[in-house]
Amino acid sequence: MITHLQKWSLLALLAAGSLSAQEWKPSDWPVLKHYDKEHLFQIALPLGGIGTGTVSLGGRGELRDWEIMNVPGKKYSTVTTGNNAPFFSIYVKSQDNIPVTTLLEGPLYSHEYLHYEGRPVNHHGFPRFAEASFDGAYPFGQVNLSDAELPVTVKIKGFNPLLPGNADDSGLPVAVLAYEVTNTGDSPLEVSVCGSMRNFIGKDGSKF
């Protein structure tokens, strides 16, 4: 249960194809550049150690550009396309309202429904947050999600294991994500954050 202004976070460690989680203590991060909802389509923060490949945190919260198989994979999401691409979602239930499950991503742009092969963008039919923005200060990036119809805001924080002067630790094959949820109302909420990620070993993104 979370109450007003309390935050819960999920730490997701992606290393060697594995996923683990633990509680994260929220803290303020530096911001050098802010991008609003209209300028997120090409925003992607590469997450991963030096020389280990990366997966990028997109400007609206999506996981994209999975380049961990030693080949370029821009736009690769581990699948051709569809609702089985990796994603995180949030479940919110108050004491007196119907529970809601929403994709932890901001809105799509209209042109993303116009693929040259006639197929839609990943998760095109999922409910999403209405508002999104991105704050960057490499190696840190933050996606800010909000919606007037939801009693929570979410901040997605991602960063690299970049330690200047320490090549070994900077080369760890790891990406770090934290999902911070804030209750914007006065009533307690039941909140869960969960993720779905298929095993895509054997695919490198070169023929997607």
What are the roles of these predicted feature ranges?
Residues 50, 57-60, 68-71, 95, ...:
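An acidic- and aromatic-residue-enriched active-site/binding cleft used to recognize and process polar
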